Amino acid sequence: MIVLLSMTGFARAQAVWVDYAWSVEPAKENRFFAAVDKFTNSDVFKTFEGRMLINSHAANGSAPQNFSFAVVYKDLATWEATQANLNGTADWDRFRKALAANGTLVSETVYTHVAGWGEINNERFSWEGAAASVSDPANYIGRLTRLMNSNLMQDYPGSIDVWRVTAGGTPGVNHIVVFGGNSWSELESYRAELAKNVDFRAAIAGMAKVRTLLGATWTTTAASYGPLDLNSVR
């Protein structure tokens, strides 16, 4: 798997995305994902109210992770309740031990949802994440909202969501913009066509006044679990 507030607190109920990045050696992938399969079929997982995407990383620069768990909850309270429900259970303990035995946890990052547009496929999607430093969040979201509501983007073939970095993350990055689509080629082809439009280029140039891009990650969803519809978090 994207607030108008510059502070780190939660002013209202907002969706939370907790990202766990893992480095897994090829020889251990089968055991790693067998642990995922066992846990997601356990009794304790039946109480899970969020959405957990297992994403495979195709390109993320020098970062060592090749898989990540993108776990999305409708709000912070639901995440906290889930953690309280899991802690101390045998299924949760076995799951964590199995993951640690077959992979290395690289990072944990908490994001808070800001705004989003377009339809998300909950089961299978290709993702492009753009890491950014945003100096004026309200200005940036305002510009992006005007663009997304314009005729230029009426046939955009996917989703765009902006998330604020709330805890953890890469120094300097305070927002991540997530583009989702059926394929990277479809997203890139659409973007290439948009780049020919003078109004689109002007809109992007305006955003660049308050937003600096710091990196990009490409992932694809390998598996999806849980009842939460990601379209409902907006």
For each predicted feature, which ranges?
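Bacterial N-terminal signal peptides
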Residues: M1-T8
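Short S/T/G/P-rich N-terminal loop/turn motif that feeds into the first structured element of a domain
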Residues: R12-R234
